[in-house]
Amino acid sequence: MSAYPKFDVILKALNLSSVGVIITDPEQKNNPIIFVNTGFENITGYTKEEAIGSNCHFLQGDDTDKEEVAKIRHAINEKSTANVLLKNYRKNGTSFMNELTIEPIYDDNDHLYFVGIQKDVTTEHNYQLELEKSLWEIEKLSTPIVPIKENICVLPLIGSLTHDRFQHMSDYVSEYMDNGKEDYLIMDLSGLADFNEDAVMNLVKFHGFMKLTGVELIITGISPKFAMTLMRYQENLSSLTTYSTIKEALQFY
């Protein structure tokens, strides 16, 4: 008795799977599909009769990520594995996010095939986008830009200026300035919990970034401890305008 399951058992198992399974033959012209399982039909809406003989390109649209498609092409050329996330389209025209893995396999005659395992991760992808959007909104709330006058706004910093927070802050300020007409940005540091070397380096970078935008950066709320740390970077911050308080700064602008 054979230790291996019969072909019809394997086929039945494949068709019971909820993931899509396709097999293509890259040794034929245009690498056509030669097998799809029921999972593929359920995900895409295409029947096996419609899919077999076609290249997988028919699932793509104009907004399918070209870089991800290039990874697939490279893997096929190199006879290697690829893992990609593609925006694909069902037969009814609706889109879905396809988490696709392709693997080269050989039969007993060393004939090359590619097996593709596809999973509809649209729900997970949309959740991730919503999560990122929510985190961005939270970050905006933790980095409030307050308009004071027609051409002046204030950015009060509270807590710690970590690398990640600095990056989010830079992105948010850049977006804000692109849509505004401010000439001056007052950054108030009086609420910062600490001001270490990393925070100073981030401030140096931010100062350079603001100079490129044409918006003058004004720093207020510098404690004596902060001032001592800043002294070591005087060359980089020599053109930086500072005041004790926001109120004092506004007297000059």
Swiss-Prot record:
Entry keywords, A to Z: Chromophore, Flavoprotein, FMN, Photoreceptor protein, Receptor, Sensory transduction, Transcription, Transcription regulation
PROSITE patterns: PAC (PS50113), PAS (PS50112), STAS (PS50801)
Protein name: Blue-light photoreceptor
NCBIfam families on file: sensory_box (TIGR00229)
Taxonomic source organism: Listeria innocua serovar 6a (strain ATCC BAA-680 / CLIP 11262)
PAC domain sequence ranges: 80-133
GO function terms (MF aspect): photoreceptor activity
Summary of the function given for this chain in its UniProt record: Exhibits the same spectroscopical features and blue-light induced photochemistry as plants phototropins, with the reversible formation of a blue-shifted photoproduct, assigned to an FMN-cysteine thiol adduct. Positive regulator in the activation of the general stress transcription factor sigma-B.
Positions of modified residues (S-4a-FMN cysteine): 56
Description of post-translational modifications: FMN binds covalently to cysteine after exposure to blue light and this bond is spontaneously broken in the dark.
InterPro entries assigned to the protein according to its UniProt record, in alphabetical order: Bact_StressResp_Reg (IPR051932), PAC (IPR001610), PAS (IPR000014), PAS-assoc_C (IPR000700), PAS-like_dom_sf (IPR035965), STAS_dom (IPR002645), STAS_dom_sf (IPR036513)
Record-annotated STAS domain positions: 142-253
Keyword Manganese found: no
PAS domain segment(s): 6-79
Source organism, top-level taxon: Bacteria
